[in-house]
């Protein structure tokens, strides 16, 4: 990050880092505005655009949580996977998962990659290559690598990797009145209601994200 930040910009950047460390995902514009006393999310948006121009973050247009922290020392997004100083944690990269087989079965692991453990809220167990755009508005895009910590339980509202029948999907978990729903973050996709007769299991919770392609 070559350009010096203003005091307010640094406050916003610190808030983004703290939120990512706590939840695994960045805050919304409304959450930034509320936390820092802005009159509207538009004020937060102006500061975010300034941070993006200065190279501190990347923004995904149209996504409420589409904020990506940049790697220090102006490394490119793909350098998070290859830069020797950042490659302190080696994780299996899981591609497509075959029906009925364990997610970390050897045939699903495309390769192992080295990553900076400081990128994540909690230490992940594996990376999952994202397929599709159903979680776009959470800033999770096609081809991104979702950092996942294995877990059989999750809190309401967490983004999870779930197995439903023969499919593995990334969605936001919602439990309400004894019913489980898997919610997309894109209005083009419908929520998935888990029936009592469905084979359902949690494979893990999302603790961070790596973008391998630059935003356009």
Curated annotation (Swiss-Prot):
User: Which UniProt key words apply to this protein?
Assistant: Autocatalytic cleavage, DNA damage, DNA repair, DNA replication, DNA-binding, Hydrolase, Repressor, SOS response, Transcription, Transcription regulation
Q: Which GO molecular function terms does the record list?
A: DNA binding; serine-type endopeptidase activity
Subunit info here reads: Homodimer.
Protein name in the entry: LexA repressor
Q: Annotated DNA-binding ranges?
A: 29-49
Q: Which family does it belong to?
A: Belongs to the peptidase S24 family.
According to its UniProt record, the EC number is: 3.4.21.88
Q: Which organism is this entry from? A: Bordetella pertussis (strain Tohama I / ATCC BAA-589 / NCTC 13251)
């Amino acid at each position: 990050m070559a350009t010096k930040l203003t005091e307010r910009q640094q406050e916003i950047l610190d808030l983004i880092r703290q939120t990512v460390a706590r939840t695994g995902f960045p805050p919304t514009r409304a959450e930034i505005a509320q936390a820092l006393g802005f009159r509207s999310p538009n004020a937060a948006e102006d500061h975010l655009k300034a941070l993006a121009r200065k190279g501190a973050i990347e923004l995904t247009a149209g996504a409420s949580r589409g904020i990506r922290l940049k790697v220090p020392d102006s490394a490119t997004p793909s350098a998070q996977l290859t830069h020797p100083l950042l490659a302190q944690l080696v994780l299996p990269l899981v591609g497509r998962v075959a029906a009925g087989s364990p997610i970390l079965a050897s045939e699903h692991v495309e390769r192992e990659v080295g990553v900076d453990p400081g990128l994540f809220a909690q230490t992940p167990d594996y990376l999952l290559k994202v397929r599709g755009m159903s979680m776009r508005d959470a800033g999770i895009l096609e081809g991104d690598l979702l950092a996942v910590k294995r877990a059989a339980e999750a809190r309401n509202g967490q983004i999870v990797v779930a197995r439903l029948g023969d499919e593995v999907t990334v969605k936001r978990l919602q439990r309400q009145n004894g019913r489980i729903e898997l919610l997309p973050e894109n209005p083009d996709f419908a929520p998935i209601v888990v029936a009592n007769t469905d084979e359902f299991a949690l494979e893990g919770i999302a603790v961070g994200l790596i973008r391998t392609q630059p935003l356009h």
